[in-house]
Amino acid sequence: MQMASKRALVTGINGFTGRYMAAELQANGYEVIGTGSQPSAAPDYHQVDLADGPGLRALLAELQPDVIVHLAAIAFVGHGAADAFYQVNLIGTRNLLEAIAACGKTPECVLIASSANVYGNVSEGMLDEHTPPAPANDYAVSKLAMEYMARLWCDRLPIVITRPFNYTGVGQAENFLLPKIVSHFQRKAPAIELGNLDVWRDFSDVRAVVRAYRGLIEARAVGQTVNVSSGITHSLREVIAKCSAITGHTLDVQVNPAFVRANEVKTLCGDNARLRALVPGWETPALDETLGWMLAGQ
């Protein structure tokens, strides 16, 4: 007799990560239901705003999911209105947790996506989960506040918090750096304006990130805060060289002083030892493979 599939609720399912998360869960036997703030004709989709506490409570009472992956957030650090970070990332997440706790069924796992931005700009080198947070912008402060708030619910709900470092893939918006670079190579643009090329960052593949999330859910990593990172750094200069080698196109890179951040940290790298211990065998593709996939656009 076949076991009934587990029901997974993915908030922000129509976002960049949400689409990959849904595919990953469906491929592994989950029944996936999604929410978002915008209308959608997608099946098993419910439009509900995180600000709508009564709407969330009614929906959770109806759905009673086995697992929840909370991805809905304002994720672009350069987003203009600071108060939106707090309304969505902090208050919205609290509304969701309140709705889950009141729904009449305790889920197996509630995975909440935070961000490695909480570590801020004060630390060089390898960052692990014990590195003291030092958020440097409203986005990061909202995510760290969300983490602290979520911990208030840990006696009632099985929560795991992830801190993903930079990740990318096909379909990510061009206001993020790697899709911007890839797009210029795809169009064979003659030139690109960037900031400091000699910063080193930790890049993962979105397909590996959602595998990590599923692995953490299935490992029942409840109560844990977990970095999701490659543990390897690449400079932006190196990223451009890799794209050039893959496409055969040469891009004239112009440094725009407006894009150079003051006091920018040269190297940021995430220690993924905790993730690897919880999800044995997890790894992210080499950056060349991810860039090749993105440049092919499929």
Task: Identify the residue ranges that each predicted region occupies.
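Conserved Rossmann-fold NAD(P)-dependent oxidoreductase catalytic core, especially the SDR/UDP-sugar
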Residues: 94-138
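NAD(P)H-binding glycine-rich loop region in Rossmannoid oxidoreductase-like domains
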Residues: 50-88
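NAD(P)-dependent short-chain dehydrogenase/reductase
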Residues: 124-125, 138, 148-202, 206-215, ...
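A hydrophobic alpha-helix adjacent to the NAD(P)-binding/active-site core of NAD(P)-dependent oxidoreductases
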Residues: 45, 59, 85-86, 110, ...
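Active-site helix of classical SDR
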Residues: 142-145
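C-terminal substrate-binding subdomain of Rossmann-fold SDR/epimerase-dehydratase oxidoreductases
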Residues: 187-298
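Rossmann-fold cofactor-recognition segment
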Residues: 39-52
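N-terminal Rossmann NAD(P)H-binding glycine-rich loop of SDR-like oxidoreductase domains
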Residues: 8-26
